[in-house]
Amino acid sequence: MKAEEKNMIDIVKFGAVGDGVTLNTEKIQAAIDAAAETGETVCVPGGVFRTGTLNLHGVSLHLEAGAVLKASEDLNDYPPQDYVHNELGVLHAMLVNLGHDNVTIDGSGTIDLSGKSFYDTSVKNVPESRVPFTQAQIDECTYPIGTRPSQCIFFHNSKNITLRGIRVIDAPCWTLSFNECENVKVIGLTIDTDRNVPNDDGIHFCSCKGVIVSDCNISSGDDCIAISGITNWGKPCEDIVITNCVLRSCSKAIVIGYIYSHIRNVTISNCIIKESNRGLCFMCNDEGALVENVRVSNMIIDTAIRAGNWWGNGEPIFMMAVKHDYHIPE
């Protein structure tokens, strides 16, 4: 759909250049700020539009066919945001939406996160072993971790968020993060990251409520879909539906729980998991953790042990549990 056919603002009219070289952060942000005033959607037309951090402020994005929103390869283009993650520290992201509702990112275009530009891809992090690795095993190992944007597409404290139809590729770290969000829909996405990049998880839901993930194809160097309470241990992650997805992970295709997390009311159905170090993983690895009311049905799980420092040993289903005592950390 062209910008003129709907209530949309075309970033080109604000001076953005889709040549794959020009840094368009200020131009695209100006379009977003204008749309925040009018209630319109920002349209990314065909072309490769390079950008640093963009703050959505509740504005929706539409990516037309042939559109590529390409993340800058320069860390200086990702200034620190007003958010500190419990595990990943100060937020440096490409797309940020903090505390704004009713955001949709859709279309048939691509978000290219330029992940490999933050790694030396000529080197592999081969663990010490008494048995020498074959070249095939070395090829499966991670790149050494470097400095990189931490969470590429980041939503916090937001309601009514929909991502539909787009393609997201080459993340340097977590691809999509939803923290303390409500009514989230991720439908028909393709997420394709380099399988040698450590921590380039597909989707993280942290302390969220009311989530639907359907008809997605996710290939990642770490977890494809992770459900936890890592950003707010005292708030449960609940009412989650995952269905009709194809998942391929060097770590865990789907992981439920982590340290103190409280997870409840999760259904997983009609998914294919293949070439994964672990299929389904349940982690209640602290006395304060709780996972309850989870139903899994109609799954095909095909695992394969991958060399290197990945989590897992080819288990289709893995459970880590300790006795729950209802303690929640301060």
Positions of PLM-derived features:
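Extracellular/periplasmic carbohydrate-active domains that bind, remodel
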Residues: M1-E330
